[in-house]
């Protein structure tokens, strides 16, 4: 299933190019605001594997779509993208919205392994247009998740705006992710707030000179209904896995003793 939309960011125009019966009520809702969503709360996020104690990692509040806010470890650190895509349901298309400054500073979307036929990409004129496009996209039951990238700390991105996104995500059963590039963690209505950055790759199992699996360090610093924490994660075929942090210590501290 592929859904393509032609959208004039900031102009309030949404035109469906390929009609899809599963999204028809939601498309009508984008234009009239009167349609009811058909989404169910457990469809937008994937909970992978068994419990975390067995080495797998499950997203806090998995199965309960809401608004998550992600802060990049540095303005041009793209590690958050791998962390985010490792959690999402790839069975439905993603709506990915970027404002102009986010594109200029960090580039357009190019996620390896993501079928471009399942990606709806919107280049928004400004942060206000990003918020508008995200809120409208959350009304579509056929969308797997809505991702929005905003650069800096625009005045329009206040508590009320983030609260609106959180309510829309929970009402319609579609997960929303607001990515803050070069932003400050001010007051927000997001239920989950993260700091995510790239971490050293794992050792390659066959070639010690080659990079292994990519890893990310994710800090959950605010959460409703979940304990904050920090994890190092690797994306494997069946989901995100916990990875042990490297320890910098002497051989004596590690328990090794000199013999002979």
Label every PLM stretch briefly:
Residues 80-86, 133-134, 161-164:
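A short acidic, amphipathic alpha-helical/loop segment
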Residues 97-158, 162:
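Long, charge-dense
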Residues 150-206:
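A contiguous pocket-lining binding segment that forms or flanks enzyme active sites
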